[in-house]
Amino acid sequence: MSDLDEIRRRRMEQLKQQQLAAQQQQGASLEQMQQEEQARQQFENQKKNALRQILTPEARQRLANLRLTKAELVNAIEMQLIQMAQAKRLQIPVTDATLKQILRETTSNKREIHITRK
């Protein structure tokens, strides 16, 4: 019976070590996810602050409304506005009329597809 007890004890130790290793791995991946989330939030805060300085309240409201339907387009335009402001190629603050013009220029590049039925 002592051999059987010894085998059980070893197996229990192995299982405990495996469980501990799994918990450590989960903890490491959880920490990594938290760091990534924190970095993403920090980036979003920096972007929001930059846009606050670049855009007038009316222009910010227009982007917020547009975000409801075309989030990818708004993200691209926001990044474009920030880059243009950093390169000093943009007159700050950007008014609603200027933003409308930028939106027209950005969206006019897309081709329209017409389907005619016979």
Curated annotation (Swiss-Prot):
| GO MF entries | DNA binding
Enumerate the SUPFAM superfamilies for this protein: Double-stranded DNA-binding domain
Tell me the keywords, alphabetical order: DNA-binding
Q: Where is this region: Disordered?
A: 15-45
Q: Spans of biased composition, class Low complexity?
A: 15-44
State any GO CC term: cytosol
Which NCBIfam families is this protein grouped with?
A: PRK04239.1
Q: Which HAMAP family match?
A: dsDNA_bind
Q: Which family does it belong to?
A: Belongs to the PDCD5 family.
Identify the PANTHER family for this entry: PROGRAMMED CELL DEATH PROTEIN 5
Name of protein: DNA-binding protein Msp_0595
Tell me the organism: Methanosphaera stadtmanae (strain ATCC 43021 / DSM 3091 / JCM 11832 / MCB-3)
